[in-house]
Amino acid sequence: MAGTFHWVIATAFILTYPLAYYIVLVLHSDRTAPLFRPLINLHFVLGMIVLFLVIPRLLWRIFNVEPEEAPGSRVEHILSKLAHWGLYALMIVMPLTGYLGTSGPPINFYLFEMTKFPNTALFQWLQLDWATFEPIVDVIHHFVGKWIAWFVVLLHIAAAFYHHFVRHDTVLIRMLPERVGNWLLAK
């Protein structure tokens, strides 16, 4: 189950990036461009998938037996735990700040509609000023997305490859789908 959560969340999280870069670099964030609305909606949906799946993923992590720790020093184990909790923080911060920074009419995804944060009772109850609130959330979303998320994700991938190609342990194998893991074991 942990592997399924891992790959669905990782796929959704990673796919948000080419969409965001296409919107910014190719469409120049032009809201009138024909592809802007479908791409930004897909970016948003993928972010919400990450946010909605990270809760059961965290519950699974907390209430189930963790896999056996890979060989390594105490420092490596501490760094591994910090990196994993950093990934969980990213899986919450990125989609949450993305949602909190949206305004305007509800987004119609055809299967459901999602009310944007400033139109919610919570926003009204908190008595927030959108002109003050939105730029702060937007800066967090874009700064973390551009500078921190890529670093942490690439560090995670590098660590998996390090375990596989340098340490020759099963850390990478046990997180891959069974057929891929078996193929790598045969090599």
Give residue spans per PLM region.
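Membrane-embedded alpha-helical bundles that constitute the cytochrome b-like, heme-associated redox core
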Residues: M1-K187
